[in-house]
């Protein structure tokens, strides 16, 4: 991803382009793990916001059909393509600095602002990529379980889980990575992105090979921590964790009413409570018709004849096993994948992340007394999409607390 700094022509010498450019880059790159390994594509400007990936399918090997007869030209084969579309989006944020503050510590404010904004936008890019990667259906569950809700605290990530994921990728003929970030050749490998908690559980295994044991022999990825069975592990603090979206209680409900008032409704709960979502109230499952976050109400698809007592548990079943209080276990998602399993898509120069600094006076009539300056960061265009679902395995598991 290219990093640029846009500087207003009226800016003073305090705005050092190279310095702030470097500051934004350093902080953003600390967050870019998932976004580092995708197949990168750019889109030309003025060609719309939707981008189409074309993935060629492998030819089917058939010894009989491929046997040549002397002097006979065989029929040609047709290329088969799978099309994947994705839409780019822009992201951005800024902070405002008063002229009074600028007279005492303006450079420090710009420096700190660029650092904080770089980390914020870098994290957003990481989340967008991570969530796209975790939308796949090629899932395996630790401990031999068959679904997320059945995972318990005992179902931690093990070496056997990694071996199974590698087998899945090999059987799917997933391509292996053969070079490092700077293009230098290294041994063919798959990549695993995992949380520090998942790393903690794996490192206790005697088969774990710490990065210090081979660091001198190969060029490493940023954040690389070790390897197992041809898998290189890269750690991310933003690795996916599936937490229970709704966990609250009933505040009030009347008999024969389809609307329930909840004791609380978080932003996460509001995002989950869309039409058609499944919700447990006590032991009964209900379907959501609508939700009103401001009033903490949920309208169900059907009225409930008996009044639901206040204090009754209200919860979703989108995390791990429930405890006696209906609280779901946090489930971690560890990704093991091959090259070209997913793509990151941005505009002509790669969805540049850039700082935009506007000094006092640049706003004209909108700032008649020249009291305000701003420093912002903007992702010009970015998105991510899975290109081959069979080449990316999501292992869902518990972790040691």
Residue ranges and their predicted role:
Residues 1-86, 389-394, 398:
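N-terminal "assembly arms/tails" that initiate or stabilize quaternary assembly
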Residues 61-64, 105, 201-204, 211, ...:
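Short helix/loop capping segments that flank catalytic or ligand/cofactor-binding pockets
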Residues 153-160, 208, 236, 240-312, ...:
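Autoprocessing Asn-cyclization modules and mimics
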Residues 222-245, 319-339, 343, 354-357, ...:
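Long, compositionally biased low-complexity segments
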Residues 283-285, 299-341, 347-350:
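Cys-His-centered catalytic/binding microenvironment captured across papain-like cysteine peptidases
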């Amino acid at each position: 991803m290219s990093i640029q700094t846009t500087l207003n022509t009226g800016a003073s010498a305090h705005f050092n382009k190279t310095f702030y450019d470097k500051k934004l880059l350093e902080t953003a790159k600390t967050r870019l793990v998932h976004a580092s390994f995708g197949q990168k594509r750019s889109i030309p400007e003025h060609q719309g916001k939707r981008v189409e990936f074309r993935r060629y399918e492998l030819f089917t090997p058939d010894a009989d059909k491929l046997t040549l007869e002397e002097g006979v030209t065989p029929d040609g084969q047709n290329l088969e393509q799978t099309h994947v579309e994705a839409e780019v989006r822009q992201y951005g944020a800024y902070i405002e600095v008063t002229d009074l503050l600028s007279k005492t510590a303006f450079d420090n404010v710009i420096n700190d602002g660029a650092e904080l904004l770089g980390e914020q936008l870098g994290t957003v890019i990481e989340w967008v990529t991570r969530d796209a990667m975790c939308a796949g259906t090629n899932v395996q569950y630790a401990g031999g379980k068959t679904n997320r809700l059945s995972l318990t605290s005992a179902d931690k990530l093990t070496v056997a889980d990694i071996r199974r994921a590698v087998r899945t990728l090999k059987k799917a003929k997933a391509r292996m990575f053969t070079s490092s970030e700077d293009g230098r050749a290294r041994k063919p490998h798959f990549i695993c992105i995992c949380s520090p908690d998942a790393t903690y559980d794996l490192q206790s295994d005697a088969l774990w090979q710490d990065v210090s044991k081979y660091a001198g022999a190969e060029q490493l990825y940023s954040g690389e921590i070790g390897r197992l069975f041809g898998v290189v592990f890269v750690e991310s603090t933003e690795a996916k964790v599936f937490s229970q979206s709704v966990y609250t209680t009933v505040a009030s409900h009347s008999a024969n009413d389809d609307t329930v008032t909840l004791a609380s409704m978080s932003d996460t709960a509001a995002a989950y409570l869309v039409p058609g979502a499944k919700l447990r109230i006590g032991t009964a499952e209900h379907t959501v018709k609508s939700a009103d976050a401001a009033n903490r109400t949920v309208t169900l698809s059907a009225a409930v004849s008996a009044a639901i007592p206040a204090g009754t548990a209200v919860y979703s079943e989108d995390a791990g096993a429930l405890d006696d209080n209906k609280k779901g276990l946090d489930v971690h998602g560890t990704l093991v994948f091959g090259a070209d399993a997913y793509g990151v898509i941005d505009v002509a120069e790669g969805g540049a992340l850039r700082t935009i600094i506007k000094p006092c006076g640049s706003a004209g009539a909108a700032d008649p007394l020249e009291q305000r300056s701003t420093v912002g960061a903007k992702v010009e265009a970015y998105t991510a999409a899975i290109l081959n679902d069979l080449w990316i395995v999501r292992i869902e598991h518990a972790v040691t607390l």
